[in-house]
Amino acid sequence: MFSFFKKKLSEVLQSGREDVHTPPEQASDAGMPVDEAFCSLDDPAGLIQEDSAIGGAGAPALQESAVSTPQETHARFPPEQTPPAVTEPQQEPESDRSRWLGRLKTGLKRTGNTISAAFGVSQVDESLYEELESALLMADAGVQATAYLLDDLKRRVKSTCAETPVQVRALLADAVTDLLQPLQKPLVIGEYTPTVIMVAGVNGAGKTTTIGKLTRHLSEAGQSVLLAAADTFRAAAREQLSVWADRNMVEIVSSAGGDPAALSFDAVAAAKARNKHVVLVDTAGRLPTQLHLMDELKKIRRTISKACDTAPHEVLLVIDGNTGQNALAQVKAFDEALQLTGLIVTKLDGTAKGGVLCAIARERPVPVYFVGVGEKLEDLQTFNAREFSEALLG
């Protein structure tokens, strides 16, 4: 599935460990010293002192965080997997993709049926466009995207002299594909080491589960992953992410009740010291209207950049595909606060509001990296504009 990975490694990286708890079965791999050239973890508190007014004091949280105090840390270090020196793009098995496309079409069936019903006429006239307008609005495509698509469709019909509803449907599929095409971009891993990915979203969007799935796919693609459990508020959030860390045999940095920004700093610093390829930072769910929590997200972002000058390299927002136009509002709010680089759309299995991606493409075209249609690992796949367009129209 991850044929989009682009990795620039000139040599095989080795991992060092110190000042952390190592499980007995892996103790033989833990004797390698940490290269001090990467980062010093002795006293980074001063770096985030200026942010201590938001979300708690930075320095004490650093002292309690996963890296600096092993007794408060839940860290797991699996046997190292030596990454390949060069990773070529991997071809995804066609059968797996075909099965997923079937699930996507099934998931968007309610949306597709509404739009397909508009083509149940015998001729192409103004009534057809009126039915399409109603169908697109019901699918939560939004006023702007609906008006744009209808104008584009009429131009295509005129230029091609289309005369049947079947021909018009094909032209609409082309119009939707062209509208969604700017959202189809690859997630690039390997340009920076580590690649720091910050993940945000509202409560219940499936953020932590999505991180777990993404971790599995990254690991299978030869990437060494470190998880940062910066959701220190939700009950059992740390434990839920720890379960995914155990399943995927990756390291996790966590601290009960610690400061999320301080923990994120420690996680990035630890990843630099141990030559990890990817850091996934899980943050607490919040509504855009909770301004103090949005300020905390900004603090986490600033603190990550102090641990690594170029980080975060990706800021992803997980949105629930069932929320329709509310998802667009979330994208706008989080983008203004964090400067989003990508989206992950979940829970598209059974939604009648799949047209919201058209609204996002028209009003806030943030790339969509992944689309989820279920709970299984293989249900999270890369976004393709043509495939989504065909599934959307039924």
List the predicted regions and their residue ranges.
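Non-catalytic terminal/linker segments enriched in charged/polar, low-complexity residues
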Residues: 1-175, 193, 220
